[in-house]
Swiss-Prot record:
Single GO term (MF): choline dehydrogenase activity
Species whose genome carries this gene: Escherichia coli O45:K1 (strain S88 / ExPEC)
Known EC number: 1.1.99.1, 1.2.1.8
Keywords per UniProt: FAD, Flavoprotein, NAD, Oxidoreductase
Listed pathway(s): Amine and polyamine biosynthesis; betaine biosynthesis via choline pathway; betaine aldehyde from choline (cytochrome c reductase route): step 1/1
Name of protein: Oxygen-dependent choline dehydrogenase
Reaction equation(s) it catalyzes: choline + A = betaine aldehyde + AH2; betaine aldehyde + NAD(+) + H2O = glycine betaine + NADH + 2 H(+)
Cofactor(s) needed by this chain: FAD
Domain of life, per lineage: Bacteria
Length: 562
């Protein structure tokens, strides 16, 4: 089999590339996906409110685990990644958050990455998006990904939480992806107008999969990329339960889009990476690149949970006897509780003036429950997810075997810097102050977690060690740049090799301020033009907010927590 391009991974970026490259009817593409189809009648992936279900099994989730995390009481922590058409866009929380403009401007400060500034990238965010309230300077109106805005009156807790943030002295923003990210406001979601998950399989592949020049293989586990000298010339994979490899040749390029955990593994199995690691497994060295699998980053978060004094939370939706009605309303009408991920409000703040742009993110949820659906509080409640955005901690992904079915050694080194601890202490204390604003008085009951007895630095630190969880945002393991630890250049081309690019969240040099999916899709759109040799979209002229030393909040808290 021969194709012009072979794409490994039908995820948030891979599906973008498959769709854009096959717009040229003379270009042939093979898209390999280790998981299965995105079954449209499976409520677990298609119903926004069911977002916890895919994380509880292994049909759609790689269900990786970390090595014992040394600064987290040696816990082995979850590292869920999407498996199936759509990749992690098939199982994520559907929060459409792009990050802060200064994240991308910060990338562009690196020599050679000047074309990755915010205004260079904004046209590609817009190209990917159809926002339900129409386009403007920041948002698209005819892109493949449906974005739904929060509507008034969905749940009184959303507006109360936003208002509490404003009463605490922080800004209000009407669009976390618009002129000003900093502040509290409604959160956009990747949900269709009919209440379905807007994965990249739905948005992109649906328009491309019938093209004769696109071949899609599911249940195709990539073993390795093979080379002719320093040129990538094809891919070998295992189909289904077969132990006999299948191979195909790439006439132009192999495009690695397997994500921040799998992309470095595939490179390492293919002979690209740290020479000592490869020698350990008798893998012939094709090209030494010490940065492969290093620079691993993530967002860590924790929940502050409160009893809700009024019966307005989503607690009744967790009762089995209410779920058939919710399911029917969603299935036949695309409306109701099932049609939202219920992350409809949130915010970004600077915890201290030393940060030039927000370093803390909030997701508000009108129920008290773990992200993966476990440990639901058996009463009306609500919670704040809060976490730091740009931790200096760095980890790694390293193969433990040549077997593609063997999970790698993953270590994030969460909380390995003093800055991490300071940010989480600040975040918990600021959150408590926000929760004690007048806007929440009629709803706020007792603090369920961490609990009012948890006050000192030592107590807060111990709570974080035992209870903080991943936000499922790994990135950085094939970083873009030109230093000795960089893996790809500004166009995703792997240093020292030909015919091979990496296009996914692994190329992010530094993690962004917010959820990763929207930016991963943008990376796919921007790289697609580069691969096709097309001129970049014209640079945007939109204005964007820069704090420039402004106070982190307009006034002191209006009341003390206690």
């Amino acid at each position: 089999m021969q194709f012009d391009y072979i794409i490994i991974g039908a995820g948030s970026a891979g599906n973008v590339l498959a769709t854009r490259l096959t717009e040229d009817p003379n270009t042939t593409v093979l898209l390999l996906e280790a998981g299965g189809p995105d079954y449209r009648f499976d409520f677990r992936t298609q119903m926004p409110a069911a977002l916890a279900f895919p994380l509880q099994g292994k049909r759609y989730n790689w269900a990786y685990e970390t090595e014992p995390e040394p600064f987290m009481n040696n816990r082995r922590m979850e590292c869920g990644r999407g498996k199936g058409l759509g990749g992690s866009s098939l199982i994520n929380g559907m929060c459409y958050i792009r990050g802060n403009a200064l994240d991308l401007d910060n990338w562009a400060q690196e020599p050679g990455l000047e074309n990755w500034s915010y205004l260079d990238c904004l046209p590609y965010y817009r190209k990917a998006e159809t926002r339900d309230v129409g386009e403007n300077d920041y948002h698209g109106g005819d892109g493949p990904v449906s974005v739904t805005t929060s509507k008034p009156g969905v749940n009184p807790l959303f507006e109360a939480m936003i208002e509490a943030g404003v009463q605490a002295g922080y800004p209000r923003t009407d669009d976390l992806n618009g002129y000003q990210q900093e502040g509290f406001g409604p959160m956009d979601r990747t949900v269709t107008p009919h209440g379905r998950r807007a994965s990249t399989a739905r948005g992109y592949l649906d328009q491309a999969k019938s093209r004769p020049n696109l071949t899609i293989r599911t249940h195709a586990m990539t073993d390795h990329i093979f080379f002719d000298g320093k040129r990538a010339v094809g891919v070998e994979w295992l189909e289904g339960d077969s132990t006999i490899p299948t191979r195909a040749a790439a006439n132009k390029e192999v495009l690695l889009c397997a994500g921040a955990i799998a992309s470095p593994q595939i490179l390492q199995r293919s002979g690209v990476g740290n020479a000592e690691l490869l020698a350990e497994f008798d893998i012939p060295l094709v090209h030494e690149l010490p940065g492969v699998g290093e620079n691993l980053q993530d967002h860590l978060e924790m929940y502050l949970q409160y009893e809700c004094k009024e019966p307005v939370s989503l607690y009744p939706a967790l009762q089995w006897w209410n779920q058939p009605k919710i399911g029917a309303e969603w299935l036949f009408g695309g409306t109701g509780v099932g049609a939202s991920n219920h992350f409809e409000a949130g915010g970004f703040i600077r915890s201290r003036e030393e940060f030039a742009w927000p370093n803390i993110q909030y997701h508000f949820l009108p129920v008290a429950i773990n992200y993966n659906g476990s440990n639901a509080v058996k009463e009306h409640g609500f919670q704040c997810h809060v976490g730091s955005m740009r931790s200096p901690s760095r980890g790694h992904v390293r193969i433990k075997s040549r077997d593609p079915h063997q999970h790698p050694a993953i270590l994030f080194n969460y909380m390995s810097h003093e800055q991490d601890w300071q940010e989480f202490r600040d975040a918990i204390r600021i959150t408590r102050e926000i929760m004690h604003q007048p806007a929440l008085d009629q709803y706020r009951g007792r603090e369920i977690s961490p609990g009012v007895e948890c006050q000192t630095d030592e107590q807060l630190d111990e709570f974080v060690r035992n209870h903080a969880e991943t936000a499922f945002h790994p990135c950085g393991t094939c970083k873009m740049g030109y230093d000795e630890m960089a893996v790809v250049d500004a166009e995703g081309r792997v240093h020292g090799l030909e015919g091979l690019r990496v296009v996914d969240a692994s190329i992010m040099p530094q993690i962004i301020t917010g959820n990763l999916n929207a930016t991963t899709i943008m990376i796919g759109e921007k790289m697609a033009d580069m691969i096709r040799g097309k001129d970049a979209l014209p640079r945007s002229t939109a204005r964007y907010f820069v704090a420039n030393g402004m106070p982190v909040r307009a006034k002191k808290m209006s009341r003390d927590v206690n």
